[in-house]
Amino acid sequence: DTYNNIKNNNYFTVNHISKSMIHDGHRNSASYDSTVSEFDKTNLKEEYKEHLEIAFVKDSPVQLYCKYVNEYYIKENDTVQIIAEIEHLFFEEQMLSKDYWLQLDKGNVITINGLDGYALPKIVDRFEYARPNIDIKSLLENGA
């Protein structure tokens, strides 16, 4: 299972899914036996990066390679929150803006709404850092 894999390996990947991957991405939310690879149950393919031992999801528009740091038990819903460091970040080049901001909608990255709803984000605007008593300016209108 995912939790034991993280604890045993100390590393894990987080892979954003695109619109074409939502069916298989949703299938991965099922609780498989720990001996079953989710890659064997979907059309998603493994991808390994040089010098990194944990698999990514091939064709994922954003891929994060994370190191386990700590965890906190949350009694209110009987779950564990994992704290991790992002050691490597891979993404499709067209998603990177001039100011090095990653625009997820350019990669057709899917957002999840609840447990079973999927949507495509659309950027409405970006703003400068907010400061008291100073007008807020749009970064998009200023060419960011």
Predicted regions and their residues:
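Basic, polyanion-binding surface patches
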Residues: 1-144
